[in-house]
Design a protein with these regions (language model features):
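Hydrophobic recognition helices of helix-based DNA-binding modules
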Residues: 106, 155-162, 188, 216, ...
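…primarily DNA-binding HTH/wHTH and HhH modules…
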Residues: 253, 260-272
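N-terminal positioning helix adjacent to the helix-turn-helix/winged-helix DNA-binding module
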Residues: 122-125, 173-184, 220, 229-232
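Short hydrophobic/aromatic patch on the recognition helix
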Residues: 60, 211-216, 261-262, 266
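All-alpha amphipathic helical-bundle segments outside canonical DNA-binding/catalytic cores
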Residues: 121, 137-153
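Terminal helix-turn-helix DNA-binding modules in bacterial transcription factors
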Residues: 186, 190, 195-202, 207, ...
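A hydrophobic/aromatic-rich effector-binding and dimerization subdomain
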Residues: 1-19, 70-135, 160-165
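Generic protein-terminus/edge-of-domain signal
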Residues: 1-62, 68-69, 75, 99-100, ...
């Protein structure tokens, strides 16, 4: 799970105005967090990887991603995606009736995303409320109070219209499979800078190598080893941009013990 804190403990809401063109490979890589997320496509076309699904969002569409769900965003060119993440208890205290009756049933359900398009009246209302939330972020005088009021309005519309048993645009997830993928990813994130084998990665969560391969193919469309290499290269890229360390040092700190091999992979990945 992401370690990064979104918002603060006394105001667990955070707004981002992201342009995918500014990210490496026009991509916000696979991640998950306890906050649920609402994302709007202001311009461009964005591919959302959510669990095992690939959803293409066009300009003017939006999406809800539930708490702790694995997701990724990609655009072939520019993709402007204003978005906000929010702790469930921002809308109402965790021990309150409001939370237990209207929030918990959704965040603890097997719904993992809901797409919003303008051909449904209630979905149009959700999108309009999202835009209001984004616009109010520039108003320092009433930002926090207005954001809370609008979030409660948004959630009311969402709760009134989403049906937990729907099999249409509301999508469900294989929770056990996703949890295994997340555990493997977390293990890689914590141990990428040392020698790791597929056997060790799989045995860490008590599954076979073939099961680990199948899970990563289903969810991430890659292998655990290729994901490990990609994560190491991502870590190396950050060190190259933000430190004055020598290439050899960066290679070793990123888990590569052959500098020539590291340089070949890095140049290939970043088209140098």
């Amino acid at each position: 799970m992401e370690i990064k804190q979104h918002g603060s403990s006394d105001y667990p809401f955070q707004y981002y105005y992201d342009n995918l063109e500014l990210f490496d490979f026009h991509c916000i890589e696979w991640h998950w967090h306890r906050e649920f997320e609402f994302l709007y496509v202001e311009s461009g076309q964005v591919t959302c990887g959510i669990g095992e699904k690939q959803i293409i969002l066009s300009e003017g569409e939006a999406i809800f991603i539930n708490s702790k769900i694995l997701h990724r965003f990609y655009a072939s060119s520019s993709g402007i995606i204003p978005n906000f993440v929010c702790m469930p208890e921002f809308i109402a205290p965790e021990n309150s009736l409001i939370y237990k009756k209207y929030i918990l049933p959704i965040i603890s359900s097997n719904i993992y995303f809901q797409r919003f398009q303008t051909d449904e009246l209630w979905q149009t209302k959700i999108i309009q409320t999202m835009i209001k939330i984004m616009e109010i972020q520039g108003n320092e005088k009433i930002r926090e109070l207005a954001t809370l009021a609008l979030m409660q309005d948004l959630w009311l519309t969402f709760y009134e219209n989403v049906k937990l048993s729907d099999k249409g645009d509301v999508q469900t997830v294989d929770e056990v499979a996703q949890k295994r993928v997340q555990l493997i990813m977390q293990y890689i994130h914590e141990n990428y800078n040392r020698n790791l084998s597929l056997d060790e990665i799989a045995s860490h969560i008590g599954i076979s190598k073939s099961t680990a391969l199948n899970l990563f193919h289903r969810f991430l469309h890659t292998t655990p080893v290729n994901y490990l290499i990609g994560y190491r290269l991502q870590a190396a890229s950050w060190l190259l941009k933000n430190t004055n360390k020598k290439v050899k040092t960066i290679a070793y700190e990123s888990g590569f013990h052959n500098v020539d091999y590291f340089c070949r992979l890095f140049k290939k990945r970043y088209h140098l």
